[in-house]
Amino acid sequence: YKRQIHQRIKKLDESGVILGSRLVVDPKMLGFDVCAYIGIRLQDVSILMQTVDRLKQIPEIVECHFITGTYNLFVKLYCVDNEHLMTTLCDRILAIPGISTTQTYISLNEAFQRQIYVDCLHD
């Protein structure tokens, strides 16, 4: 049984389905008590990649997604507290040229998290 699982994982790895492995840390254990999501609208989509490059330089931002709808980008970030969030938003994110509006959503609690389901027992 273990051999079958090992072979399946190896096949998934070789085919590029598995992108790697990593340690997952709990941000709260490191003192980051606020998880927030920010929708970002740009004045002009021609600066999209420049904006992404600037956002990459903000270590509190852990994810950035291109999205459809009202906003162009959606970022996830972790901050120590609400004051840290406000400073990050006002002094760093809104300081990026070309950002016209943002909307911030604070996560009250994570209900669950998971990776996409892969059936390791069947091909």
What would you call each of these model-derived segments?
Residues 2-123:
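A compositional/biophysical signature of low hydrophobicity enriched in polar/charged and small residues
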